[in-house]
């Protein structure tokens, strides 16, 4: 039974209510104290706490801060269970927007939607975009789901219609996707003549593969007879972050982004001879390098360094920029090649569903949201219409 006594703290008199909530691992009783200016106030705090326990909340839910729980979640749960890129993204949100914010030291049990909303409004007034705040909200929503599951919160303050992402409708409109014109593609082709990675860039234009998917492609994934390739892995440069925030970079092989990303993509027939020529070049590089060459030119990666190492994203980007500069074509992100592939298919009458499958999007609505002009046609024949770009 709870014990009630008058209590003096800092010269002021309070009512104190003590309740026993169980025993620790050593058998010692666990007690919790509640204070109020009146007995009724102290009792109300006790009942609020006990109701939380009855509803499945953790016994120490009132003592844990958002910052402490988020750090534990990030470094002991997310880092061990999610892809490295996801952890890096989440750690960035934590470091840039939570660690030094007013939310960090707040007891997680008292955080309400209005406090989150005020913080978002403040960020917007400081110049942060709606897109940035929306990404932060998605991050917090995921974290608070964990907090609910672990018994530190009864409900997620970021779900439902409680939170409004600040910003004008005009700001929320996506910017137009970047693509290359037919004339620019011709200039890039010209700049690629004699380049050892010519096949990589033209295959990107001809298949729409993501950068990591191109780098993860192996010779065993290519069927020269059927003129198609199989996407089933990707090479990615990831950031490894320890609990102190120290960073190092590593190139890894991993499975594609989603289930639909694992797919078969037809290769325009005009690119087949170029791929065979690239393979012969790779064989020559192996002979020249001798025992230090690391790749298997029959079963290994299609695109490597001259010594057979995997190509990391940063080095590929440098090469890409040099090629655009040599071609006299304004810089666009590497992903613009993928957008160009999709746009050219749409221009040639390929249906939305087919383009979505070729791109490996997780659902057709993603494709529809990115590309707006769509007309029907057939898959393999559709890709063959790209041949004129390479002749």
Swiss-Prot record:
Coiled coil: none annotated. Residues 64-148 form the Core-binding (CB) domain. The active site is at 210, 244, 335, 338, 361, 371 (o-(3'-phospho-dna)-tyrosine intermediate). It is found in: Cytoplasm. Keywords: Cell cycle, Cell division, Chromosome partition, Cytoplasm, DNA integration, DNA recombination, DNA-binding. In contrast to other XerC proteins, it has a much longer N-terminal part. This is Tyrosine recombinase XerC-like.
């Amino acid at each position: 039974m709870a014990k009630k006594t008058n209590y003096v703290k800092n010269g002021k008199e309070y009512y104190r209510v003590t309740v026993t909530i169980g025993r620790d691992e050593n058998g010692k009783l666990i007690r919790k104290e509640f204070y109020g200016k009146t007995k009724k106030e102290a009792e109300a705090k006790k009942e609020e706490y006990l109701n939380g326990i009855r509803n499945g909340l953790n016994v120490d839910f009132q003592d844990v801060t958002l910052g402490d729980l988020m750090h534990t979640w990030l470094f002991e749960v997310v880092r061990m269970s999610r892809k490295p890129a996801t952890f890096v993204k989440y750690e960035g949100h934590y470091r840039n927007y939570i660690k030094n914010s007013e939310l960090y030291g707040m007891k997680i049990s008292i955080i309400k939607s209005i406090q989150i909303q005020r913080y978002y409004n403040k960020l917007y007034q400081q110049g942060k975009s709606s897109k940035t705040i929306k990404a932060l909200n998605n991050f917090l929503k995921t974290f608070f789901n964990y907090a609910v599951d672990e018994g530190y919160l009864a409900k997620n303050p970021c779900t439902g219609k409680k939170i409004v992402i600040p910003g004008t409708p005009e700001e929320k409109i996506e910017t137009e996707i970047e693509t290359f014109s037919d004339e620019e593609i011709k200039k890039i082709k010209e700049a690629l003549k004699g380049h050892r990675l010519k096949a990589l860039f033209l295959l990107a234009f001809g298949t729409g593969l993501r950068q990591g998917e191109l780098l993860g492609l192996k010779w065993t994934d290519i069927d020269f007879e059927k003129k198609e390739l199989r996407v089933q892995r990707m090479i990615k440069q990831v950031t490894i972050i320890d609990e102190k925030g120290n960073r190092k970079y590593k190139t890894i092989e991993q499975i594609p982004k989603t289930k639909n990303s694992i797919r078969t993509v037809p290769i325009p027939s005009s690119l087949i001879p170029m791929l065979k020529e690239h393979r012969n070049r790779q064989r020559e590089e192996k002979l020249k390098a001798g025992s230090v060459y690391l790749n298997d030119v029959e079963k290994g990666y299609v695109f490597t360094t001259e010594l057979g190492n995997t190509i990391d994203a940063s080095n590929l980007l440098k090469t890409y920029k040099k090629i655009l500069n040599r071609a006299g074509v304004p810089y666009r992100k590497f992903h613009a090649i993928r957008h160009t592939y999709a746009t050219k298919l749409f221009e040639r009458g390929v249906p939305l569903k087919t383009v979505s499958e070729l791109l490996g999007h997780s659902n057709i609505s993603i494709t529809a949201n990115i590309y707006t002009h769509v007309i029907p046609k057939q898959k393999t024949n559709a890709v063959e219409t790209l041949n004129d770009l390479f002749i």
